[in-house]
């Protein structure tokens, strides 16, 4: 019975409450801190579980009144409401019981790179960049450009952002993959629709303690910074390129005002990429028997199509199609794509966990 799975959480919460009132514990700051953190982590489950158990009682009480001449009709209405509430609470609790992604609350590096399609791909990188920063702004996140390479006709060949805010990774982690765009270029006189593609990578910002890099595995090159079109923008060798020799990963940064700043920014991106690579390998092992693009954040496959003539956006992982592309690209309705992706992932995780 589902209720039986909840009682250990209620018992543990009450046990911790009693321990936190114990004078011996109060004088032990380390134990107090550990118990307080555990209690905080259990509290949402405890609150939902208490409501769930109360709802079960309400259901039984109303069932007992169904044949009552005076209260039967009211009991029938109350029973229906309680049964709906029971289902809602069950789903809420199942989500709370899922193992938390340790990266969910982290800041992210968001990398958008032009793929096939030349100038059109670079222009769409710019469009996606604008959509993401509008969404970040609406969510109250802060962002900064870590590095950028402008396209010859506008937009960007590549741009990397650091988006800061609690839950940034949890909201945007399913954006990684190939995004295909279909639209008529401004230079197209025949009105033909062109198809181009960009790739997006979402990488959690990592602490130094989370990933170790052997300095001997790095090759660091410094060079003259260059601006749009390749012209020199200063007289010092401030641009930095870092190569991680074992993996072949290369990160270049020249947007900072000093070599030190550029090296620091490049190292942060390199660590995020290496961490993402390690996480992808770990997840691939854990989910080898269950192929789920949403669950694994697979970057290799086409995840979404943006069709401008039809004002249509389609996410191929969950068979979702919306005809509000203009509003979604404006950032305000981005959650209409993100929320179903999160719900799909949670539903799969609940099934896998046997809840």
Swiss-Prot record:
The keyword Cytoplasm is annotated on this UniProt entry: yes
CC per GO annotation: cytoplasm
Cellular localization per UniProt: Cytoplasm
Domain of life per record: Bacteria
Keyword Protein biosynthesis: yes
Annotated Gene3D superfamilies: 3.30.160.20, 3.30.70.1660, 6.10.140.1950
Sites of N5-methylglutamine modification: 231
Function: Peptide chain release factor 1 directs the termination of translation in response to the peptide chain termination codons UAG and UAA.
NCBIfam families: prfA, PRK00591.1
Name of the protein this chain belongs to: Peptide chain release factor 1
Organism (species): Campylobacter curvus (strain 525.92)
